[in-house]
Amino acid sequence: MKTKAEHSIIADAIHEWHTVYLPCIRNLSHNALKSYGEGMGIYIDFLESSKGVTSNTICGECFRKDWIEEWIAWLKEVRKCSPQTCNHRLSILKNFLRFLAHKKIQFIKYDCDAAEIKRMQQPKKQVEVITKDTIKRIFASINTRTLIGKRDFALFNLLYSTGTRIDEILSLRLSALHLD
């Protein structure tokens, strides 16, 4: 019995991963699917432009740890991607390799090697603090003489005094309040 060529196995796996696994099993949104497809496409572009790999020559060796690390450096230096973008693209590739290893055990080495690749350090974002003066101006701008104004004042007061997120406040129901 003739075995299926490695490039064909990988091509079929990419197709199944993107058309069945991600949308049906993982239930990813349309935008997430687009992002995953772009991420995988960028890795394939890298293989073609930097390594001379074509759709007929793609193989397990194309997912070697050193090539993936080289790709991450390429993303940062050539494509000018931020650390967050590089980490996102790396997680997409790792996700595919995990899928591929589950489908065909012969690729498990590449999944294990990719799992060892560390994420790039991301700079901590500074939290923008609202000044007391700004808070006072927000409260002063609410017209508390109207019913809607009273509602808005109560909402802002609850948000400010508890530090609760708006979606948590909006999901509150009367039955959840205990005013005793």
Provide a role label for each language-model segment.
Residues 1-180:
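Conserved catalytic core of the tyrosine transesterase superfamily
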